[in-house]
């Protein structure tokens, strides 16, 4: 993704932590979104003042509030510097409200790089996404890009690319990498290893719950569904019944060729 996002922090708060610094950009191109962070404005009567954008909306995450304009190109996060969860959550709302208009999805998944392409392990928390990613790292030297949240973008060439994101959950994996997607894999814990391609309703049932499809503005969810439909028509999806050892790597490797 070539879009640039600029974050301005007018009070002491290191928004760009060790992981966020991987995504810092020093380019001079005009940004597609401006997002600023300011301290809450609460008077002595406990009344809070928030900025207002004509036709825009306000979103509360934890103790922070995001006020954003109609097309999600400009916004302000009002919060205290110690509300990390709220500030990061508001930033995600602002960013994704912009990206979903640009053929981009957010998928709950672990992303690895193998031979210049991305393999995405997706599924509910605890299913073994990061475990499978780490097995590929251990046995095949695959690089783990992100262990929790991945951007998926349809580029100008019509291909779908997976992009590392600054949001990484409890995972320590958080790299700024963009790769064409080779496959989406839905792991299931098992005593044996079996893999098969899935399609139709089963494919949708396995992937749909892991894609963030908000309803923040008119047509928002429909935009996301359109991009998801294109993704599932372009990228193979596999169900991997797997163990927590090298056999799982070998089974998937054989299937992918």
Q: Which residues fall in each region the model found?
A:
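Conserved lysine of the Walker
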Residues: 129
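Hydrophobic positions on the alpha1 helix immediately C-terminal to the Walker A/P-loop
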Residues: 132
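A noncatalytic interaction/capping subdomain that flanks phosphate/NTP-handling catalytic cores
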Residues: 1-125, 135-145, 150-257
């Amino acid at each position: 993704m070539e879009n640039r996002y600029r974050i301005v922090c007018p009070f002491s708060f290191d928004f760009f932590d060790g992981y966020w610094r991987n995504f810092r950009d020093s380019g001079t191109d005009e940004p597609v979104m401006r997002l600023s962070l300011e301290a809450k404005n609460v008077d002595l009567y406990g009344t809070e003042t928030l900025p207002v954008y004509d036709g825009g909306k306000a979103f509360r995450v934890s103790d922070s509030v995001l006020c954003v304009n109609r097309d999600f190109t400009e916004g302000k996060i009002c919060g205290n510097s110690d509300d990390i969860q709220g500030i990061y959550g508001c930033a995600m709302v602002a960013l994704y409200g912009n990206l979903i208009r640009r053929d981009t999805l957010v998928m709950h998944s672990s992303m690895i790089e193998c031979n210049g392409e991305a393999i995405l392990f997706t599924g509910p928390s605890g299913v073994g996404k990061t475990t499978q990613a780490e097995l590929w790292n251990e046995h095949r030297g695959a690089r783990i890009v992100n262990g929790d949240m991945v951007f998926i973008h349809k580029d100008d060439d019509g291909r779908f690319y997976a992009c590392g994101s600054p949001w990484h959950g409890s995972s320590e994996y958080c790299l700024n990498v963009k790769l064409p997607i080779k496959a989406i894999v839905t792991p299931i814990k098992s005593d044996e290893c079996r893999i098969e391609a899935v399609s139709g309703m089963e494919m949708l049932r396995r992937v749909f719950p892991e894609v963030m499809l908000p309803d923040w503005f008119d047509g928002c969810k429909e935009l996301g569904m359109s991009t998801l439909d294109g993704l599932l028509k372009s990228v193979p999806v596999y169900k991997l019944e797997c163990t927590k050892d090298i056999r799982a790597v070998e089974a998937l490797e054989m299937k992918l060729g």
